[in-house]
């Protein structure tokens, strides 16, 4: 799916997916929105920060994680790329008691320090060439492990047979 049009939601800036470093503008991709929701007045919820959690610390490129343009289709012919361009998160799971958030973000699994929830910091990221699309992130009960799942291995079209190519 694409980013909303600025005509639909003010402030949306859609950037083209590219392998060149993106370091200017304010594209809606390559960030998350941190939203504060007062429990006593949820109607006053507001975006309090928009951290660029995919940024390459060495270059400052917003698109600093897996940055591969779509590749070959799955042998079934479905339009899924085994080389996603990491520009959004599909699923994030917070474990506030230990100050961590795990994200399944298209081509990467990420771990964020949320001890300061308004200003999360990426601690680490992983990539697995056998994952087509990082789908979900779940902590174990004590928060010492994160389990990531792949869209192809679950969701609406599981592909877990030996004959299925990664």
What are these regions (language model features)?
Residues 1-166:
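Feature marking well-ordered beta-strand scaffolds used for ligand recognition
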């Amino acid at each position: 799916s694409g980013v909303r049009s600025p005509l639909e939601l003010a402030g949306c800036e859609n950037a083209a997916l590219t392998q060149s470093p993106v370091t200017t503008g304010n594209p809606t991709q390559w960030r998350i929105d941190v939203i504060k929701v007062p429990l006593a007045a949820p109607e006053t919820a507001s975006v309090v920060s928009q951290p660029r959690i995919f940024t390459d610390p060495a270059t400052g490129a917003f698109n600093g994680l897996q940055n591969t343009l779509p590749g070959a289709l799955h042998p079934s012919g479905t339009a899924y790329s085994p080389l996603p361009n990491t520009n959004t998160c599909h699923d994030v799971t917070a474990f506030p008691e230990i100050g961590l958030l795990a994200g399944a973000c298209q081509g990467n699994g990420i771990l964020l320090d949320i001890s300061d929830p308004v200003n999360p910091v990426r601690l680490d990221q992983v990539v697995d060439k056998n994952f087509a699309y990082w789908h979900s992130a779940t902590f174990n009960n004590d928060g010492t492990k994160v389990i990531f799942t792949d869209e192809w291995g679950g969701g609406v079209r599981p592909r877990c047979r030996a004959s299925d190519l990664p």
